[in-house]
């Protein structure tokens, strides 16, 4: 089962009386974001006790206070992942997909911003992997290669499910 971290956070914001477009969550007070992030991690952890999960999340979020880790240490400890799988594409393709996605509100869709986002995602993933003692895998999701990317992801998840991490 796949659970989207941002969707769980959005549900929690709504329960607090803050109905927000998902791109407005990152504009909230950083302390509030941090608390809701931890609550979301706890909710997802409870879900994971029932069945294996893939948590779809961002490694970082651009907030009004700067870059914020998508999985800060407390969140990482709650989630206790077995692996980190980064799904990447070429910066030009990411920028194109962002421009075509009319459901989202992004400040910029330039390829150079996508390049920076890929770099920051790897930095954050590296930090998480060191803290949690888990591997990082990268799946390329380039234009026309979605089926291959899905199969690569499936193979990694199947292999990860058979490995017992400390």
Where are these regions (language model features)?
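ATP-dependent NMP and nucleoside kinases share a basic, alpha-helical "lid"
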Residues: 57-102
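Short, hinge-like loop/turn segments at secondary-structure boundaries
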Residues: 19-23, 102-104, 155-156
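Post-Walker A helix-loop "phosphate-sensing" segment adjacent to the P-loop in P-loop NTPases
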Residues: 1-2
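Class I S-adenosyl-L-methionine
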Residues: 14, 95, 99, 126-133
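A short acidic, glycine-rich active-site loop
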Residues: 28-35, 108-119
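ATP-dependent small-molecule kinase phosphotransfer cores
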Residues: 7-69
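NTP-dependent small-molecule kinase module
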Residues: 122-166
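A solvent-exposed, charged loop/short amphipathic helix patch at secondary-structure junctions
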Residues: 95-115
């Amino acid at each position: 089962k796949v659970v989207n971290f941002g969707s769980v956070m959005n549900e929690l914001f709504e329960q607090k009386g803050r109905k927000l477009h998902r791109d407005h969550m990152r504009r909230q007070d950083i302390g509030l974001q941090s608390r809701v992030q931890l609550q979301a991690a706890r909710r997802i952890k409870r879900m994971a006790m029932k069945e294996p999960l893939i948590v779809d999340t961002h490694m970082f979020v651009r907030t009004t206070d700067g870059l914020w880790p998508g999985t800060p240490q407390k969140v990482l400890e709650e989630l206790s992942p077995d692996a980190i799988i980064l799904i990447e594409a070429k910066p030009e393709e990411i920028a194109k997909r962002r421009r075509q996605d009319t459901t989202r509100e992004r400040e910029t869709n330039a390829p150079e911003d996508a390049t920076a986002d890929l770099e920051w995602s790897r930095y954050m993933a590296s930090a998480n992997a060191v803290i949690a003692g888990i591997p990082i895998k990268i799946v390329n999701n380039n234009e026309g290669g979605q089926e291959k990317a899905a199969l690569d992801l499936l193979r990694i998840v199947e292999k990860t499910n058979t490995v017992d991490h400390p």
